Amino acid sequence: MEILCEDNISLSSIPNSLMQLGDDSRLYPNDFNSRDANTSEASNWTIDAENRTNLSCEGYLPPTCLSILHLQEKNWSALLTTVVIILTIAGNILVIMAVSLEKKLQNATNYFLMSLAIADMLLGFLVMPVSMLTILYGYRWPLPSKLCAVWIYLDVLFSTASIMHLCAISLDRYVAIQNPIHHSRFNSRTKAFLKIIAVWTISVGISMPIPVFGLQDDSKVFKEGSCLLADDNFVLIGSFVAFFIPLTIMVITYFLTIKSLQKEATLCVSDLSTRAKLSSFSFLPQSSLSSEKLFQRSIHREPGSYAGRRTMQSISNEQKACKVLGIVFFLFVVMWCPFFITNIMAVICKESCNENVIGALLNVFVWIGYLSSAVNPLVYTLFNKTYRSAFSRYIQCQYKENRKPLQLILVNTIPTLAYKSSQLQVGQKKNSQEDAEPTANDCSMVTLGNQHSEEMCTDNIETVNEKVSCV
């Protein structure tokens, strides 16, 4: 088989080609041994009149051809990783701005998401660019050796903080479902920030042994010139403590939350059906009551009879929030599981597994895990209207939501409410006249009914007037 590789290279680039030749000879010694033995037979170098070099390669790929191919691969890798870095930084900055500026998003869960966005943003600022640099240098560490342990520490810290935040969110949602009154009473902004501080403290404690021991002994963070965790104990313990244990807690609490929400929804539906049957019962003949009074009686609620019960609206909101969080959990697990599973396999089957294959898989899977930091803002944009509208305004440099002036609200609202109030008063007068002559059999019952309905109508009128005055 003959492979032909032709390229035009200026004479000024020959020294650079020779330097690349030396690098490639270190990486591919077998190819260069065969080249040295058959140099005169395999290649032909000619210089034309325009001082340009034409390279013709037959039967093998010479150093310059190999360097060009590797350079193209590195260019594509650099382009893809640059896109991931930009998406990670920009998207998470938008999330931080949205939670900070939008009052609708200022609750415990979104505070956790903002802290998660800070961890992902720092991962994009401090970890991903260095990882891209190592790719361009053939996975060799190009920076001072002391920075290797610091870089691994930051990588483990922010990755651990991400899953710890998701685990804390899952636990917090489960507690909110189980004890809604207690959770709403004691879950203030200060409590939420204390929980976030606890999450970061745990993440720092898990990742701190890396710089402590790595700065003392380079062999724990260097392997054949590459910056990576070379200590098997670090790999095993770190993988279980920083990923698999929080993952188990997160999955269990999430499914318990879904089960509790389904139970709450079933109870709420049964309560509504029971209330509908009881409220539809009346001591008065339907002929003696107007349709408006029947409607008022059917929706009349006894105060405090269902205190502490969750409404269908709150359950629906919880289900929507769990749906979005479930997607975030699922994507995080799917994107990080391959890396940690391969990491465990590299330690367990060190002798039977091919180290080159394991290393190549880890290099790919770690960037798939990094990609999860860029995906979260996209999930919020797709499934949350408040985030979506906030992001669109921030991209247009509009940091405050445009609201209608109070005068327009008064002009549009007061006439409608005043009209409804007048109609209600007219209807009350007509109904009182119609019910003024009851039959003898229903006299006592109708009198009580009229008193009750008049009180209800009066309350409704007062409520409407209060709304008008408040607006």
From Swiss-Prot:
Main location: membrane
Keywords, alphabetical: Behavior, Cell membrane, Cell projection, Cytoplasmic vesicle, Disulfide bond, G-protein coupled receptor, Glycoprotein, Membrane, Phosphoprotein, Receptor, Synapse, Transducer, Transmembrane, Transmembrane helix
UniProt: serotonin binding residues: 155, 343
Glycosylation positions in this chain: 8, 38, 44, 51, 54
Subcellular localization: Cell membrane; Cell projection, Dendrite; Cell projection, Axon; Cytoplasmic vesicle
Side Cytoplasmic, residues: 98-111, 172-191, 259-322, 383-471
Record GO biological process: artery smooth muscle contraction; behavioral response to cocaine; detection of mechanical stimulus involved in sensory perception of pain; detection of temperature stimulus involved in sensory perception of pain; glycolytic process; intracellular calcium ion homeostasis; memory; negative regulation of potassium ion transport
Phenotype of null mutants: Mutant mice display increased exploratory behavior in open spaces and reduced anxiety-like behavior. Mutant mice fail to show behavorial responses to psychoactive substances and hallucinogens, such as mescaline, psilocybin, 1-(2,5-dimethoxy-4-iodophenyl)-2-aminopropane (DOI), 1-(2,5-dimethoxy-4-bromophenyl)-2-aminopropane and lysergic acid diethylamide (LSD). Besides, the colon from mutant mice does not contract in response to 5-hydroxytryptamine.
Motif position, PDZ-binding: 469-471
Tissue: Detected in neurons in brain cortex. Detected in adult intestine, especially in mucosal epithelium, longitudinal and circular layers of muscularis externa and myenteric plexuses. Highly expressed in Paneth cells, and detected at lower levels in enterocytes (at protein level). Detected in neurons in the brain cortex.
Membrane topology note: Multi-pass membrane protein
Protein's UniProt keywords contain S-adenosyl-L-methionine: no
Residues the record lists as Phosphoserine modifications: 280
Molecular function terms from GO: 1-(4-iodo-2,5-dimethoxyphenyl)propan-2-amine binding; G protein-coupled serotonin receptor activity; Gq/11-coupled serotonin receptor activity; identical protein binding; protein tyrosine kinase activator activity; protein-containing complex binding; serotonin binding; serotonin receptor activity
Transmembrane regions listed in the UniProt entry: 81-97, 112-137, 147-171, 192-215, 233-258, 323-348, 357-382
This protein's GO CC annotations: axon; caveola; cell body fiber; cytoplasmic vesicle; dendritic shaft; G protein-coupled serotonin receptor complex; glutamatergic synapse; neurofilament
Record motif DRY motif, residues: 172-174
Location of the motif NPxxY motif: 376-380
UniProt-listed InterPro entries: 5HT2A_rcpt, 5HT_rcpt, GPCR_Rhodpsn, GPCR_Rhodpsn_7TM
Domain note: The PDZ domain-binding motif is involved in the interaction with PATJ, CASK, APBA1, DLG1 and DLG4.
Function: G-protein coupled receptor for 5-hydroxytryptamine (serotonin). Also functions as a receptor for various drugs and psychoactive substances, including mescaline, psilocybin, 1-(2,5-dimethoxy-4-iodophenyl)-2-aminopropane (DOI) and lysergic acid diethylamide (LSD). Ligand binding causes a conformation change that triggers signaling via guanine nucleotide-binding proteins (G proteins) and modulates the activity of downstream effectors.
Assembly, per entry: Interacts (via C-terminus) with MPDZ and PATJ. May interact (via C-terminus) with MPP3, PRDX6, DLG4, DLG1, CASK, APBA1 and MAGI2. Interacts with GRM2 and DRD2; this may affect signaling.
Entry similarity comment: Belongs to the G-protein coupled receptor 1 family.
Record-given protein name: 5-hydroxytryptamine receptor 2A
Gene that this polypeptide is encoded by: Htr2a
